[in-house]
């Protein structure tokens, strides 16, 4: 009987611990219907929104007291249309300022919880920071980070990338002041965890080698590279553009021959550039895809052009099997694969400031250098 009671007590303790752990990791994504409703709630709770709403009180009094309705109307329209814009800007700046005040606590959470590159590992960090910010009156709600991914993104854009781009200690101290030692410790913990991921990834990769039978590069299937590019960029999304082009041709007659010629040329270059960027966006959806690309480059035994051809074949098969790309034609040939590496990976090592439209992939810098060394590329000037 006593043994059963002891077992029951233990099971209750385990259940209560799990419940506490679950409660600890509840995030706004579990509370709100979607990110839009969370965003609207945050705006509604902000001081800027309340000030904007209070502005309507003196405006309504002005409307009643003024004999001329034109001036109140103009001011009301300005407040109506420009007000939301300023509210959004002020809220964004407030979030940035609040986070910058708690960099030390941010670093402590990372050092303690040791999250990896997997967004799910950031759930505890996000939940703890949400509670800490609210309890210490850094933020006026319990929902600063919507989910783990937003917390991970904040870490990269606020700490990892800006700090890694600072090459000398004086620049780091000037930007981050007393937070420098805490940031260094947090980045070391994160880098060590990522290195373990990299080694585990390579071990698993060795256990499941590529099946390269019956793989041919697009250069062997298409007569010209231009044909391959045209097949990629001309699809239903381009249909409105070309309908617009034919409309211009029909309405302009013979008056504007230059526009007739320039429009398709410009659109071709724009769509080609978008296609190249789209490939990187697709590859960046998961960290494992970028790790796979770099690992394939590092471990390729063939050298020169043949080596890049083999890398292109392996990546074409991998991305198709992982349903990242809808066919085995991600890279046209080895030269295209080499250009892609230089453009979207190797170039990151020479950047001096963060990119607003893409990640710097700081975690991958050591492996990008290793891949560059393995392919015997010339160093950037």
Curated annotation (Swiss-Prot):
It comes from the Eukaryota. Pfam families: DUP. One of its GO terms (cellular component) is fungal-type vacuole. It is found in: Membrane. One of its GO terms (biological process) is protein transport to vacuole involved in ubiquitin-dependent protein catabolic process via the multivesicular body sorting pathway. The keyword Membrane applies. Residues 64-72, 259-381 are cytoplasmic. Belongs to the DUP/COS family. This is Protein COS8. It comes from Saccharomyces cerevisiae (strain ATCC 204508 / S288c) (Baker's yeast).
């Amino acid at each position: 009987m006593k043994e059963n009671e002891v077992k029951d007590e233990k099971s209750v303790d385990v259940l209560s611990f799990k419940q506490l752990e679950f409660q600890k990791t509840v995030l706004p994504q579990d509370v709100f219907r979607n990110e839009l409703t969370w965003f609207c709630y945050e705006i509604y709770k902000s001081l800027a929104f309340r000030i904007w709403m209070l502005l309507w009180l003196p405006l309504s009094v002005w409307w009643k007291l003024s004999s001329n309705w034109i001036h109140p109307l103009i001011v009301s329209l300005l407040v109506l249309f420009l007000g939301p814009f300023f509210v959004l800007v002020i809220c964004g700046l407030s979030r940035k300022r609040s986070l910058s005040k708690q960099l030390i606590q941010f670093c402590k959470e990372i050092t303690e919880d040791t999250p990896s590159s997997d967004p799910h590992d950031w759930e505890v960090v996000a939940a703890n920071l949400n509670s800490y910010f609210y309890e210490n009156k850094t933020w006026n709600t319990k929902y600063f980070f919507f989910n783990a991914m937003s917390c991970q993104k904040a870490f990269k854009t606020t700490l990892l990338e800006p700090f890694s781009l600072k090459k000398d200690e004086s620049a780091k101290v000037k930007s981050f002041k007393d937070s420098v030692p805490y940031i260094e410790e947090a980045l070391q913990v994160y880098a060590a965890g990522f290195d373990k991921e990299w080694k585990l990834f390579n071990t698993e990769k060795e256990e499941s080698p590529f099946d390269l039978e019956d793989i041919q590069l697009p250069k062997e299937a298409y007569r010209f590279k231009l044909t391959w590019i045209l097949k990629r960029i001309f699809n239903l999304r381009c249909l409105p553009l070309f309908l617009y082009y034919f409309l211009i041709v029909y309405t302009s007659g013979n008056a504007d021959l230059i526009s007739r010629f320039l429009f398709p040329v410009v659109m071709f270059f724009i769509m080609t550039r978008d296609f190249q960027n789209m490939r990187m966006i697709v590859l960046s959806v998961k960290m494992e895809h970028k790790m796979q690309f770099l690992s394939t480059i590092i471990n390729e035994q063939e050298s020169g052009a043949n080596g890049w051809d083999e890398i292109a074949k392996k990546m074409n098969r991998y991305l198709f099997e992982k349903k990242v790309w809808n066919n085995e034609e991600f890279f046209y040939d080895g030269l295209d694969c080499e250009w892609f590496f230089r453009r979207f990976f190797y170039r990151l090592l020479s950047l001096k400031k963060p990119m607003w439209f893409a990640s710097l992939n700081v975690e991958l810098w050591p492996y990008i250098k290793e891949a560059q060394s393995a392919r015997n590329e010339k160093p950037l000037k």
